[in-house]
């Protein structure tokens, strides 16, 4: 049923033309995944509240509303502003194309009907020793829109969005909200063809109720600068693609979180038809992966690290028969991921650290990689910001996640329509 819903919503010729109709009322829980304010690390983010309300409908209007003042290439526009879209703003072909060279980076050759061949731009050494060929990409997808501090970008209704380019938050910008939009079609099938959202040295960010599909590089990327006080909630990450690293119609380029000292809550998102990087983490900091739904996934879900703390709780993994490791980890990685099968060994550690019990995730595959490294909990206990942000989230049980997240992730007619 979930696959049918996704095909209806993410048609390859239109962007978010319908809205989920099922509403789950989660009585008795206080997880604010669907509320009008962020919880977790991004709590307190207000965006453009109190500022001018600007309605935009063209590429030029949107670019100007997001940032009106620059210092060099850095946006320094910190004027509070609420920017509203009620349509899809298409940047495709607005900046022309570039013809260059590329190669096939994967070790396998894809052919119809299993999937078109994924290509990579000839950047760095990626095409070293490989056969190169002419490759043309759309420039707008690699020229992201700069977002200034104190901005809210929100779609009115379920059919608003940005096509053909993404958003960049860098240079120390802070207090930004991106809600209820689709961001799609950035050089699909061309690796390094553009990111949907890039966060590099930015803080206090809430990315909520958006949908991402057919992105050339990452749907969300952080790094190498800090990405602090970030909550990513209620989003649909749809990996269905005509291309694919593994020739199976699933994207491997979903979310790469490699910001310095990052602090990110990933709450109630839907990762569908992915084949890795959901997310991949590195560099340093804390990631709270909570109440996310995974469907029809292949190979890796979250990829752990020895440098970043990962607390994974209350997630629901349903790869639908695919070869899949929900949490890719090895001993020594900083992972604390309780399951029903191992949670008894933690004793009172969660309640002592967080002021509440940890919530177990559900999976039928890869259970051996759900580590319980108590170093993660010690690190949380020793960091007041982490302890408060994680402890403030009240996860729902994993058996409620599938219906709730499938019904509510992505853009909606009213993103605040579901109450607790």
What are these regions (language model features)?
Residues 60, 88-91, 158-159:
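Acidic glycine-/aspartate-rich tracts in secreted/extracellular proteins
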Residues 281-283, 288-420:
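Extracellular beta-rich repeat passengers
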Residues 34-82:
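Acidic Gly/Asp/Thr-rich repetitive segments characteristic of extracellular carbohydrate-active
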Residues 1-11:
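N-terminal secretory signal peptides that target proteins for export/translocation
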